[in-house]
Structure formats: C-alpha cells, structure tokens
A protein has these predicted regions:
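Active-site mouth loops of central-metabolism enzymes
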Residues: 12-28, 74-86, 139-155, 232-246
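N-terminal amphipathic alpha-helix/helix-capping segment at the start of soluble metabolic enzymes
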Residues: 1-15, 22, 282-285
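C-terminal helical cap(s) of enzyme catalytic domains, especially alpha/beta-barrels
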Residues: 126, 182, 271-285
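Glycine-rich, positively charged N-terminal anion/phosphate-binding segment
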Residues: 2-3, 26-35, 52-70
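Active-site pocket-lining/capping segments in soluble small-molecule metabolic enzymes
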Residues: 118, 122-143, 191-245, 250, ...
C-alpha cells in the first residue's frame, strides 16, 4: 500500500524507529515492534543509519520484518549524498523485490568519514532519478524552522517545492517544540502551492542530552515553556520523562485540534513512549 493513499484520506499515525547496531539488540527491537504494531500505526519508518552509514542491510531487514511479520506498511529512509547511481539502482531493485513501495527520500547528513558522490546533491535529485524506475511512493522531509543549511525560509520553501515537484507525495516534518512555528510553516507552504499532506513530527523529551543534540541537528528552537521543563527536571530522569511526555501530548492534542494531517512520532525505539502517547489520544485521532 502506498502511504499517500492513507495520508490523503485520514489523519495518519506513524512511528519512526532505527535499526539496531548490534546483533545483541535484535531481541529488543522485536519486543519494540510487538508493542508498536499492536498500536496499529498507518506506517513505520525505518532510518538508514546515523551519519549516512553505508551499512543499510539492517534497514532493509527491519522493513521486511515489519511488512511480512506484522503486516504494517514500512517506509524506508534512503539517503543519497554518499551513493552513486549504480548503488541507488541496486537498493531500488532490492526494495522492489521485497514489495516495499514507500521511500523517504533524503539527502543525508554530511559525514567527514564518508566520500560525497557527485550523482545526487539533493533529495529532489534522488526522487527524480528513481521515479521512473519503480512503483514507489516518495515521502520527503521538511523543516518547520528551516534546515540548518538553508539561508532563509524563502530558500527553504523553494527547495521543498522542488522536492514536491519531483514527486514527493507526503512530507514528514522534523521535530519541533513550538506549534506556532509549524502552523506558520504550513501556511507558507500552501501559499507556495505545496498542497501535499504535511505530517508534523513530534519527539517527546525524555533525555536532556539527546534532545539538545537533536535540536542542534534539526534547527528547532526552545520555547520558554519548554526551556523551563528542561531546566527544572534535567537532573531527575523520572520527572523529566513524565514532564516531557506531558509536553509532547499537549503538543499533539493541539495539532490534532487544528486539523493537521496526522502525527509522526519519533519513538527513539522506546515502546513506552509510543504506548503512552497513543493512550492519550486514542479517542482523538
């Protein structure tokens, strides 16, 4: 099933997970999937490896497991900055053979340990190249507060429109903590005639060090209310978890009340996070 079919007809609920780095963690990911799939998401996206890692085997295996064992639609992240056309062709061949149609097309993070290839400079290049090569549904990433490398919001919207014009049918947003920023971003997209579903991405604050790293990577800002939570509870793990979950839940309820296209939850492979969020919105979404 193509994710665009679900996202165009309902408010979607989806999760992001990442493949385990070690064989010893495979049992944990199975237990995580048991919980996540029981929550009946519309899809689960599987990341491609931190920093543009060339080891994508675990991504494919995890996506296969989600589709075959749990009958939930997987979305495979695919980066292109460190790949040439032949390597992308092989990846597309494997996805087609496994019946995986949904691809989140990404440029990928720059990595000083990996050589950047000249074949693909942007996610839009990847989409344009792969679109005629298979029956894929392409998703794209978007940044409500601008990609860290974008000069300004005008440039950000221009690049995003290029991505949609290339064939991205659904946009998943990076994390943010101020819903007002997201609403302004969506309005700017609609003015620019970007009319595909834009699904907000939410990451509950459960680990202060992790969240600060993600904000540096994604360009998200700290609203004052959010800063108070971090400062008040960052030295109390249990309190930060509860406060972070409550903050995320309040964000999600507000987003759904304002008729956003769904919710994409960055689970950090933590099934407790997903379950608590879903319990809090079971009668809303």
């Amino acid at each position: 099933m193509k994710i665009s079919d679900a996202c165009n007809h309902k408010k979607s609920l989806s999760f992001e997970i990442f493949p385990p780095k070690k064989d010893s963690e495979l049992i944990n990911i199975d237990a995580t999937l048991d919980v996540l799939c029981e929550l009946q998401p519309d899809f689960i996206s599987v990341t491609f490896g931190a920093g543009g890692s060339l080891n994508c085997n675990r991504t494919i295996e995890l996506a296969k497991k989600i589709k075959q064992n749990y009958h939930v639609e997987p979305v495979v992240h695919l980066t292109c900055l460190h790949y040439n056309r032949a390597e992308i062709d092989e990846f597309a061949r494997i996805l087609t053979a496994e019946g995986i149609q949904n691809v989140l097309a990404l440029r990928g993070d720059r990595n000083p340990d990996l050589t950047e290839k000249d074949d693909f400079k942007h996610a839009s290049d990847l989409i344009s190249y792969l679109k005629p090569k298979g029956d894929f549904c392409f998703l794209g990433a978007c940044y409500p507060e601008c990609h860290p490398e974008s000069a300004n919001k005008i440039e950000e919207i221009r690049h995003l429109k290029e991505k949609v014009n290339a064939g991205a049918e659904v946009l998943l947003s990076q994390l943010f903590f101020d819903n007002t920023q997201f609403y302004r971003f969506v309005e700017d997209c609609r003015i620019a005639d970007i009319n595909v579903p834009i699904v907000p991405g939410i990451m509950p604050v459960i680990n202060a060090a992790q969240i600060k790293r993600m904000i540096t990577m994604c360009g998200a800002s700290f609203p004052e209310r959010f800063q108070k939570i971090i400062h008040k509870f960052e030295d109390n793990k249990a309190a930060l978890f509860d406060a972070g979950m409550s903050y995320a839940l309040s964000q999600i309820i507000d987003l759904l009340a304002n008729d956003t296209d769904g919710i994409h939850l960055y689970t950090m492979n933590n099934p407790v996070v997903a379950r608590r969020i879903c319990e809090g919105i079971q009668h809303i979404i």
